[in-house]
C-alpha cells in the first residue's frame, strides 16, 4: 500500500484546487469501478499527497460564516490576496508564503479508518513532526488542528489548521502548517471562526538553518497514515 507524492512548490490556489478535484474525482471513479470488476494483481496506490506553498489567499469552508471575514473581498485583493469559497469543512483561514500546505487525496477505506481517525492521524503527524524540531504542541478538545500553549494559561495559538472533504471515504483538502508565515494576514479574519484564540509559528526559530524546505518531508506523516 502506497501513495504518490508530489511537491508542487509555489502554486496558485485555484490551479491547485482544480488539480485536487481532478485527482479526487478520478480516485472515486477508480474505486467504484473496482467494485464491479474482478480484483487485479499487483499493488495499487491509495491516492496522491500534494505539498504546496500558496501565494496569499483566504478560503472559507462550506459551513463557515462570512462574518469571520473581517474585511471585504475587494480590500483583500487590494493587499494582494485572493479569496475563495470552497467545499471543505471548517471556517475561514489564510494560506501564504512560509506555510506548508498538504493535500492528501487518498482512499482512507483502504487504511481501515474513518474520517475522525483520519483527522486524528493528520493532527498526530503534525504534532510528531514539530516535536522533532523541539516544539511542544497538542490538540484542543472540540476543535480541529494543532495548537501551542494551554487553555489553563489562556495562551492557545494555532500553528496548523485542518479542514477536509470526504466522499466514499476519499479525501481532499488537508492541513496548513505555519513555519514562517506573516501572521499579520490573520488580523483580517477570525481564524477558523475563533475570536478568542490566536495563531502562531515556532518552527522557524527552532531551526538551526531556517527554511521551509527542511520540513517538506514531514518525517512522521508516513508512520501515522
Regions picked out by a protein language model, each given a short descriptive name:
Residues 1-156, 184, 215:
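N-terminal lobe of the biotin/lipoate ligase/transferase fold
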Residues 159-162:
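Histidine/acidic-rich helix-loop-helix segments that form or flank divalent-metal centers
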Residues 164, 181, 204:
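Active-site donor-binding loop signature of nucleotide-sugar glycosyltransferases
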Residues 168-179:
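Conserved phosphate/anionic-ligand binding catalytic regions in large, soluble enzymes, centered on
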Residues 184-225:
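C-terminal accessory segment of soluble enzyme catalytic cores
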